[in-house]
Design a protein with these regions (language model features):
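Left-handed beta-helix
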Residues: 3-4, 9-10, 15-16, 21-22, ...
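Conserved catalytic-core motifs of eukaryotic protein kinase domains, centered on the activation segment
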Residues: 48-49, 146-148, 174, 208-209
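Short, low-complexity, polar/charged sequence segments that are solvent-exposed and flexible
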Residues: 60-61, 160-163, 215-219, 224-227
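Short glycine/proline- and charge-enriched loop/turn segments
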Residues: 138-145, 213-220
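Conserved beta-strand-loop-alpha-helix hinge in the C-terminal portion
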Residues: 194-219
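Intrinsic low-complexity, glycine/proline- and repeat-rich
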Residues: 219-250
Length: 250
């Protein structure tokens, strides 16, 4: 259902069973997949020359909450979910089931994998590369300018299964390798090795992630986290984790 106050361009391609809320604007160069909901006061496909005439593509079964703005020129696969007042700039390419929390900002020219979870108030700078099954907690900032202000852009890379805890800042060009954990309030200026915990300002290696124990089961390692946490993930993913990481420990 399209609310009577919504403005939907006749050039936009709207799938089946799509709900568009009050006072939302859908611009020309937009493709919206089936069974998608866009709440009120959103602006979808905001025009910009930086999009190079490419459309905004929103996959099937997505849910965009109110007051969010998506620029033209980005592509999101199925089951995109946002909080309120999210801004996503052009040339952002994301896989399945990206979740972007309230008041988060994706600055564009980004590549984001499958099942990425970005909580509220996350800033993802231009040229960021984010892998699969990443968790980014509130107030994290991914930077890109090594000597601001300048024309140099060095995006941050976060590889599969890594976690960036709340209020951390990743400096330009940093790579966080697979299965790693960045502790809360960290300032990361150097690459993070695979399967390690770093924390502090500047961040230093603390230990291997396997040394971190579950609070309620101190005899068990908390990492890799798919061995004990799978809430919200589909069976096909969980079954693959069982093959990769072994049976669930709790």
């Amino acid at each position: 259902m399209i609310h009577g106050s919504a403005i939907v361009s006749p050039k936009a391609k709207i799938g089946e069973n799509v709900n568009i809320g009050h006072f939302t604007v859908i611009h020309d160069n937009v493709i919206i997949g089936n069974n998608t909901t866009i709440e009120g006061y959103c602006e979808i496909g905001y025009p910009t020359p930086l999009a190079l005439n490419q459309p905004l593509v929103i996959g099937n079964d997505s849910y965009i909450r109110s007051h969010s703005i998506f620029y033209a020129g980005s592509t999101f696969k199925d089951k995109l979910i946002t909080g309120h007042r999210v801004t996503v700039r052009e040339k952002t390419y994301a896989g399945n089931n990206l979740q972007i929390g309230t008041l988060s900002d994706v600055q564009g020219d980004c590549n984001i994998g499958d099942y990425v979870r970005a909580h509220s108030n996350v800033h993802i700078g231009k040229h960021s590369k984010i892998g699969n099954y990443i968790w980014i907690f509130p107030f994290v900032v991914l930077t890109n300018d090594p000597h601001p202000p300048s024309e140099t852009m060095l995006g941050v890379t976060i590889k599969d299964y890594s976690i960036i805890a709340t209020m951390s800042v990743l400096l330009p060009g940093v790579t966080v390798n697979e299965l790693s954990l960045v502790g809360a309030h960290s300032l990361v200026k150097d690459d993070v090795e695979t399967g390690t915990v770093v924390a502090g300002s500047p961040a230093k290696m603390i230990c291997e992630t396997s040394s971190v124990k579950l609070r309620e089961h101190p005899e068990l390692s908390a990492y890799p986290w798919p061995k004990h946490f799978d809430r919200g993930y589909p069976d096909v993913v969980i079954n693959q984790w069982r093959k990769t990481f072994g049976e669930k420990i709790i």
